[in-house]
């Protein structure tokens, strides 16, 4: 029986490519979590046309009823979940906006998706993850969530306060999830995909194929893999 992976925000970009690589290179059954049925179905058909075992799962990470329905479907069809990739995320602030000028509403809306929704999905699917022999939880973060790199001047004047704060919070949640699994075969880690060129990031510098690699690596970690780490292509990043 193949392992089952759920990727949120999987109808395009890094999420879709993560699903593709897990199915194509590692034999996973992949569940494409997406809010829009048409976009999710189109993504599923794209992977199926490549001969991959892909299924659309209607999932709005910001909607509790949608999450509950998705959990029931996965439980009924598979009885467990081996991998959860919290890939869904948003960048809502303008690149040039100084932190004091970013509206509170932008922070709230950013946290709603990047933090609260990720926790809601993780919380709901946690029992199914624990039914796996070796679950892998991957939170797609970003190095802009590193307090150390912002403090030492690495990013200069680039201070996207909503995005950075939300990813720092996601990193902290990852550490807490990992602590729950400290004496188990399960693993929880945060991934930095790098500057990926997507519809949501027109300033990206690398392909989605490259950007998905860290998530795939963390989703397929062996028994001796890290737990509670912040990584990019096997390299640890500073918190």
Regions found by a protein language model. Give the residues of each.
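Conserved glycine-rich Rossmann-like NAD(P)H-binding loop of the short-chain dehydrogenase/reductase
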Residues: 26-42
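A glycine-rich helix->loop->beta "capping" turn
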Residues: 50-53, 73-86, 92, 103
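Canonical Rossmann dinucleotide-binding motif of NAD(H)/NADP(H)-dependent dehydrogenases/reductases
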Residues: 1-31
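Catalytic loop of short-chain dehydrogenase/reductase
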Residues: 90-91, 95-111, 116, 130-182
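C-terminal helical subdomain
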Residues: 168, 183-186, 190-193, 198, ...
């Amino acid at each position: 029986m193949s392992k089952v992976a759920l990727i949120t925000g999987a109808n395009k970009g890094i999420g879709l490519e993560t699903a593709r690589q897990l199915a194509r290179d590692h034999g996973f059954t992949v569940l494409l979590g997406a809010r829009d049925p048409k976009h999710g179905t189109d993504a599923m058909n794209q992977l199926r046309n490549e001969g991959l075992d892909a299924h659309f799962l209607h999932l709005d990470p910001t909607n509790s009823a949608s999450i509950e329905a998705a959990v029931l479907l996965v439980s009924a069809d598979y009885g467990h979940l081996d991998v959860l990739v919290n890939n869904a995320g948003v960048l809502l602030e303008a690149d040039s906006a100084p932190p004091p000028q970013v509206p509170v509403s932008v922070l709230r809306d950013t946290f709603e998706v990047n933090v609260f929704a990720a926790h809601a999905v993780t919380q709901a699917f946690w029992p199914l993850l624990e039914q796996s022999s070796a679950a892998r939880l991957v939170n797609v973060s970003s190095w802009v969530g590193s307090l150390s790199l912002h403090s030492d001047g690495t990013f200069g004047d680039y201070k996207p306060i909503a995005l950075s704060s939300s990813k720092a919070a996601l990193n902290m949640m990852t550490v807490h999830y990992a602590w729950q699994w400290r004496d188990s075969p399960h693993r929880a880690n945060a991934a930095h995909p790098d500057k990926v060129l997507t519809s949501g990031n027109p300033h990206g510098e690398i392909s989605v194929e490259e950007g998905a690699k860290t998530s795939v690596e963390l989703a397929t970690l062996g028994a001796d893999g890290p737990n509670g780490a912040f990584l990019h292509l096997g390299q640890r990043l500073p918190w």
